[in-house]
């Protein structure tokens, strides 16, 4: 940099390749730290929380299964009840008709036989009485006629005697008394049992009619069953009463464990950030410190150039020095300590040294990144998640869910019993009232036939023993049905469900923790793989330089061998003409011969000509 002064040169020292390399290393470490921290912090977001929805999905499946089973149960029960209702109706009517028909036939036979006997006997009695009365009245009439003539004579004589003593000739005629007596006998003559009595007796011959009892009974029995079947037909799409099956809420395992997971993630990322900051600070300090020797070197160069240029200007002589070798290779200050050999020049040339420096820089970056990753590995060991809060929530959630299931089954049980058997219970009550009314009608019919007869008591007893007692039993059975007809839905096994849910939660707990741990391990493994790849690449670059070293050794050995051969051939011809070893030039001589330096900027020579005029050249 011959055109720049010392201050201008110092202003660009920070742009040296060493500082640039350290800055690149710092950037690489920073990017590595950022990506690693981001990966660690994102692990909780990628945790498998799908297990949280598992209980809800299971409860939905249970709900669908329970509702489908309940609907199938209700439909099957409705169909069964339709068949049962028709069967019971026909059986009841068959029993009633059998009992009523049997005893109607018996009643008819008893009534017909009794009425025929009574009618025939009564008719004979009436006819006999009428004949006897007529004969008796004729006999009495004959006697009365004779008595009437005697009495008339007595009356006539008495009347005449009375007239004699009284002298009254206007006395009543005796025929008046005779007429009166004859009239009385005439009424007795017409005396007989009326024929209407025979008509009433003949009415008993007519068969007793129980058809009204049958028709009314059949109508009464069919009415509740018809109403019941109509109601069932309306409930073909029997709903479940609008009661919803309880669903388990999401477990929120990740929400509960998120605090622990976030704390672990924060701790790991903090450790990584701290380690990266330390490394970055060290690299920044190194980047600053590496400029110190460079500044010093620039200062030495500047002083030397000032002295040389001043001496040259003072002599007013232009010397041309070759500075290419001194300034083209910036590693010259370090290489000067190495033996001045061809091999060192070859392997540390600009082409070869680039691969070596980049490879070593890569290894250094890998080493720094591995330090950060190693800190993460150490911190990641023994990462556990506190599941006590999860267990507590599980216990509370399970208790609430089981109570909700109990409430659901109880409501469904009441709903099904009401919709399926509510009408059955009302029908049983109606049948009870129907049977009661039937017995009342039957008793009224029997009483209308046998009332005020000697058969009333026995017939009522027979009716009760044969029909009434059975109807009482039927009424008792219907009452029992009304009190006990219900469906008891079997409840779920609470203990088994609770154990299963706890098993799911424990698996989800371990899943949450294991997923986080696996995420950390996968992240570490991924970055290890990346670091290994960077290590391989860096080693490959160093290997290229090593290969160049081997090539240089081969070339150096070859050249040395050729040189020895040439020297051997020259030795025989120059045995007598030996030249002594050259003497090293002094510094003044080196300046005169232009050894190692060249002045390429006349402007600088003129600039310092007046300043350095008259000065001597100092030894450097």
From Swiss-Prot:
Glycan attachment sites: 130, 169, 190, 215, 235, 267, 396, 432, 443, 484
GO biological process: plasma membrane fusion involved in cytogamy
GO cellular component, one term: plasma membrane
Entry's localization field: Cell membrane
Protein origin, superkingdom: Eukaryota
InterPro entries: PRM1
Residues in compartment: Extracellular: 1-19, 108-274, 374-534
Disulfide bond among keywords: no
Coiled coil (residue ranges): none
Role description: Involved in cell fusion during mating by stabilizing the plasma membrane fusion event.
Family classification: Belongs to the PRM1 family.
Descriptive protein name: Plasma membrane fusion protein PRM1
């Amino acid at each position: 940099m011959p055109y720049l002064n010392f201050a201008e040169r110092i202003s660009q020292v920070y742009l040296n390749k060493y500082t640039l390399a350290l800055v690149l290393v710092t950037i690489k470490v920073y990017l590595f730290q950022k990506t690693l921290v981001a990966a660690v912090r994102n692990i909780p977001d990628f945790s498998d929380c799908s297990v949280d929805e598992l209980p809800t999905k299971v409860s939905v499946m249970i709900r669908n299964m329970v509702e489908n089973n309940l609907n199938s149960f209700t439909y099957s029960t409705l169909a069964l009840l339709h068949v049962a209702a028709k069967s019971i109706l026909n059986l009841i009517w068959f029993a009633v008709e059998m009992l009523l028909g049997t005893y109607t036939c018996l009643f008819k036979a008893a009534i017909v036989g009794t009425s025929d006997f009574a009618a025939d006997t009564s008719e004979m009695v009436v006819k006999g009485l009428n004949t006897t009365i007529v004969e008796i009245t004729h006999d009495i009439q004959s006697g009365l006629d004779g008595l009437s003539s005697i009495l008339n004579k007595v009356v006539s004589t008495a009347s005449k005697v009375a007239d004699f003593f009284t002298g009254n000739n206007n006395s009543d005629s005796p025929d008046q008394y005779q007429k009166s007596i004859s009239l009385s006998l005439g009424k007795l003559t017409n005396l007989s049992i009326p024929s209407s009595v025979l008509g009433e007796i003949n009415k008993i011959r007519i068969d007793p009619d129980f058809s009204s009892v049958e028709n009314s009974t059949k109508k009464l029995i069919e009415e509740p069953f018809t109403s019941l079947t109509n109601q069932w037909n309306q409930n073909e799409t029997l709903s479940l009463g609008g009661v919803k099956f309880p669903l388990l809420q999401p477990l929120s395992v990740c929400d509960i464990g998120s605090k622990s997971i976030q704390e672990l993630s924060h701790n790991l990322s903090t450790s990584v950030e701290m380690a990266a900051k330390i490394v970055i600070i060290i690299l920044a300090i190194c980047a600053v410190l590496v400029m110190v020797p460079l500044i010093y070197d620039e200062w030495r160069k500047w002083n030397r150039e000032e002295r040389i240029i001043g001496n040259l200007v003072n002599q007013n002589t232009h010397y041309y020095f070759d500075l290419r070798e001194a300034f083209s290779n910036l590693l010259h200050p370090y290489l000067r300590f190495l033996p001045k050999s061809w091999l060192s020049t070859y392997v540390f040339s600009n082409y070869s040294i680039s691969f070596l420096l980049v490879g070593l820089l890569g290894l250094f970056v890998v080493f720094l990144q591995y330090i950060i990753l190693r800190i993460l590995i150490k911190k990641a060991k023994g990462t556990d998640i506190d599941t006590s809060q999860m267990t507590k929530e599980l216990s509370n959630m399970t208790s609430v869910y089981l109570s909700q299931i109990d409430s659901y089954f109880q409501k469904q049980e009441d709903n099904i019993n009401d919709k399926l058997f509510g009408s059955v219970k009302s029908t049983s009550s109606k049948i009870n009232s129907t049977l009661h009314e039937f017995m009342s009608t039957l008793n009224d019919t029997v009483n209308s036939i046998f009332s005020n007869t000697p058969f009333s008591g026995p017939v009522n007893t027979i009716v009760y023993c044969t029909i009434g007692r059975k109807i009482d039993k039927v009424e008792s059975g219907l009452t029992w049905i009304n009190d006990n007809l219900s469906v008891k839905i079997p409840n779920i096994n609470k203990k088994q469900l609770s154990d299963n849910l706890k098993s799911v939660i424990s698996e989800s707990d371990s899943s949450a923790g294991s997923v986080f741990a696996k995420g950390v391990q996968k992240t570490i493994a991924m970055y290890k793989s990346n670091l290994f790849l960077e290590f391989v690449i860096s080693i490959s670059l160093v290997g290229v330089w090593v290969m160049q070293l081997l090539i240089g050794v081969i070339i150096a050995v070859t050249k040395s061998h050729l040189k020895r051969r040439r020297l051997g051939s020259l030795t025989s011809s120059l045995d007598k003409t030996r030249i002594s070893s050259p003497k090293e030039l002094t510094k003044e001589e080196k300046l005169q011969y232009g050894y190692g330096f060249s002045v390429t900027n006349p402007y600088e020579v003129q600039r310092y000509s007046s300043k350095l005029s008259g000065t001597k050249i100092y030894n450097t």
